[in-house]
Regions:
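Bacterial N-terminal signal peptides that target proteins for export
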Residues: 1-8
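Extracellular glycan-interacting surfaces
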Residues: 9-15, 20-618
């Protein structure tokens, strides 16, 4: 089977086999948000909005973004980024989607039932990402898509495709397309290096370079309402205006506080909006000057409004969900209730508090606290922090290892510890009076009230665990047992592994599988030969989650076995695990926090448990 055939088969399996998370007993904690890469407003209903995410979800709002739910299957496009959503101007109710794959490749499909089902249209397209799409009003069946190799077109709604820019080797990575509303045979293509135009439906092309810097990647092309021929291009270096469909460009940047500008919109009242990776910028003088407005932590991927409701403006943001303005961009509010496309980097429970660390979420990145085991998360319980990589409790205090330093919680506030500065701290672990922080370059330990560097005369530490009265540490080539008086090298079944303590056993996991070493033993015992990850759950009985390929297993101390768990998302997306109040919680990268009651229904009846070596506490 060729790669194209394989991708097609995989795509159709995704469309038919995806099930809602609730169908298998899983539900989501109410931490709303998403990495929203595209929006589409229904042409006939300004309150109906679709949102596509970087994790393959498609959400639908019927109340102008106040609430969201799955448009169809819970995860219709796993492994794909929903980069483009377009309603067909020639086919009422038809919604088109353009996808690009995390592992490569792309897809084009349409839905005639508001996202409940999809029909693939890729015959003749290369196995490349679909970065953008343009449909042509008055030209039924004509569609353009931008790919890595240029512009491809169809005249029969995707039944067949042909490359339109084959004679232009520089017209690569087409990330934006625009069809002139007054001249449907005129199409502009923005590429990784400036833009091109065709005036004959894509048969021939001309570079439209005058006034534009050579290395300008053109992210978007936007017309100005009521001003034929005037368009704006956003690039990696501010914005450009052309009065004549790209015949000549002029760059504008005065007032911008960030140059990289993925999105743009020209409002009917004459104001211009430019969405940068560091907030929204507004111009009231035709683009001569700009001023940032709103939260600078928002990375804005798209700006949308409906002609019937131009005062209502939607922002699609990277990691921060959807933001909506009801007053013509004077103010914006987050509006993502029901979206679970959040990235969870850590889970922990301390006393009555459940802590969930969200990352890459703009202004809501940090630690969210629930005092009712995840039923609600209060705004007062949120603390913005750099990406949290680990959480631990030590002698009455909570510590957070982050991408920019080690933090300690004092009361309701968090404080960065000065000794480590802004270095990346990947792990923090305690045992009795000992507290150790592992950074990207070394080890630190708490002595008295200060952290000091602990000698480690090996490579960059990759993992650490307290076990048997010693600190065990791996680097890229070996395993070492450290005590106050010794520094011993320990043989391992493979190099480059990571450590995890499982009661009275030490587990080694990584590309060489998962192995266990019981206390007082010197031999490693293989659990699986598949590349694996182990995640602690903080629970005495159900103490560890093992991810091996597409298989997820939960360790049961009573039976001393790993039991297979059915999960509703790709196993690779699981980033953290916690058992709390009789429930298994999974933190994910792109699907929020998933929760399932512990019980036999969690485990498929046909799956045989995997045993672990017996130990006294095993």
């Amino acid at each position: 089977m060729g790669r194209r055939a394989f991708l097609l088969l995989l795509f159709f399996l995704m469309l038919t086999a995806a099930l809602p998370a609730s169908a298998s007993g899983w539900r989501s904690l109410p931490l709303w948000g998403g990495d929203v890469r595209s929006l589409a407003i229904h042409p006939d209903d300004p309150d109906m909005v679709f949102a596509g995410t970087s994790a393959g979800q498609l959400y639908l709002s019927r109340d102008a973004g106040r609430s969201w739910s799955d448009a169809g299957a819970h995860l219709p496009f796993p492994g794909w980024v929903v980069g483009t959503l377009r309603f067909d101007p020639n086919k009422a109710g038809r919604l088109w989607v353009g996808l690009w794959g995390i592992w490569g490749g792309g897809q084009v499909a349409f839905s005639d039932d508001l996202g409940k089902s999809w029909v693939s249209r890729v015959s003749g397209l290369p196995e490349e990402p679909i970065y953008t799409m343009a449909l042509v009003p008055g030209r039924a069946g004509r569609i353009y898509v931008g790919t890595l190799s240029g512009v491809w077109g169809t005249e029969d709604s995707g039944e067949s495709w042909r490359r339109l820019t084959g004679e232009l080797p520089d017209a690569q990575k087409v990330t934006s397309l625009l069809v002139d509303a007054n001249q449907p045979d005129t199409v502009l293509a923005g590429t990784w290096r400036r833009a091109y135009r065709s005036d004959d439906g894509g048969r021939t092309w001309t570079g439209i370079f005058e006034g534009m810097v050579l290395d300008s990647e053109v992210f978007s092309l936007t017309p100005v309402p009521g001003r034929p021929g005037e368009i704006w291009a956003t690039t990696c270096g501010w914005v450009y205006r052309s009065p004549d469909l790209g015949g000549k460009w002029e760059r504008f940047k005065e007032g911008f506080e960030e140059r990289r500008t993925p999105s743009f919109s020209a409002l009917p009242d004459g104001r211009l909006l430019a969405g940068t990776v560091a907030g929204l910028h507004v111009s009231t003088d035709g683009g001569l000057t700009w001023k940032r407005t709103g939260d600078p932590a928002l990375s804005i991927q798209g700006i949308y409004w409906h002609p019937k409701r131009p005062e209502r403006i939607y922002l699609a943001t990277e990691g921060s969900g959807v933001w909506v303005s009801s007053d013509s961009a004077a103010t914006f509010r987050p509006s993502s209730d029901g979206m679970t496309n959040t990235r969870v980097s850590a889970l922990a429970s301390f006393g009555e508090e459940l802590m969930v660390a969200l990352s890459h979420a703009g202004p809501v990145s940090g630690i969210h606290i629930s005092r009712d085991r995840g039923k609600t998360f209060e705004a007062a319980g949120f603390t913005p922090l750099p990406t949290v990589l680990d959480l631990t409790w030590h002698e009455g205090r909570i510590y957070a290892a982050t991408e920019r330093g080690l933090y300690e919680r004092r009361g309701a506030a968090w404080f960065r510890l000065n000794e480590l500065g802004e270095t990346r701290v990947e792990q923090v672990l305690g045992e009795g009076p000992q507290l150790v922080a592992r950074t990207a370059t070394g080890l630190w330990e708490l002595r008295g009230t200060k952290f000091v560097q602990r000698p480690f005369q090996h490579g960059t530490p990759r993992s650490a665990a307290f076990f048997g009265g010693a600190l065990w540490v791996t680097d890229g080539s070996g395993l070492y047992r450290l005590t106050a008086t010794s520094n011993d090298t320990v043989a391992t079944p493979f190099a480059g592994g990571r450590l995890h303590r499982l009661q009275d056993q030490l587990l080694l996991w990584g590309p060489g599988g998962a192995w266990t070493r019981p206390a007082l033993e010197t031999e490693w015992i293989e659990l699986t030969d598949k590349a694996s990850r182990l995640l602690p759950t903080g629970h005495e009985r159900w103490s560890s989650l093992m991810v091996s390929g597409d298989t997820v297993r939960l360790y049961d101390r009573d039976s001393r076995k790993f039991r297979i768990v059915d999960v509703p998302v790709p196993a690779r997306d699981i980033s953290a695990a916690l058992v709390l109040g009789g429930k298994l919680m999974l933190g994910t990268s792109g699907h929020g926090v998933l929760v399932h009651d512990l019980g036999e229904e969690l485990f498929p009846a046909s799956a045989a448990p995997a045993p672990v070596a017996a130990g006294t506490g095993g």
